[in-house]
Amino acid sequence: MTHYLLDTNILLRSRDIGSPDYNLIDRTIRYLISNNHRCFITAQVLIEFWVVATRPAAVNGLGWTSEETERAVQMLINQFELLEETPDIFRIWLSLATTHKISGKRIHDLRIQAVVLAHNISHILTLNPKDFIQVEEITIVHPHSINS
């Protein structure tokens, strides 16, 4: 059994039936769950989900209301295991940020990796593998590699 953290883009596509990636993501998540893999989410990916879901469609968002987004977030919390925010996350994040000299927007993805390390999660499922740095203990997985 493998443990996967679902990246924000995976969650967004899983709830956006109009997305060209919807079927790929749906198939991948169903495959993982039916093969006894565990799928996790964290507060950060839910916060990022909210940002994109409530942003207007004209600026690359989903254009949802707060109420629609709240329902979607509750569904995600009910469907996947929500990882606890622990004090170790900041320490791990700071160590990764300084060791790898990460700056700018990549810091957000680095924090996801810190959460994964703090909880001994082995894999991150994402549509954007290049957003993540290479960390020996973490395998970054694109849905195509699971569904091929």
Predicted regions and their residues:
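Helix-adjacent hinge/juxtasegments
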Residues: A53-E81
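Active-site neighborhoods of divalent-metal-dependent phosphate/nucleic-acid chemistry enzymes
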Residues: E81-L127
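Acidic, PIN/NYN-like endoribonuclease modules and their adjacent C-terminal/linker elements
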Residues: H3, L110-S148
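Alpha-helix/helix-capping structural signal
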Residues: N9-I10, Q44, D88, K130
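Short, well-structured N-terminal submotif of metal-dependent ribonuclease cores
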Residues: M1-I41, A58-E68, N147
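Structured helix-beta-strand junction loops
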Residues: N35-N36, Q79, V135
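Short beta-strand segments at enzyme active-site cores
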Residues: F40-A43, T126
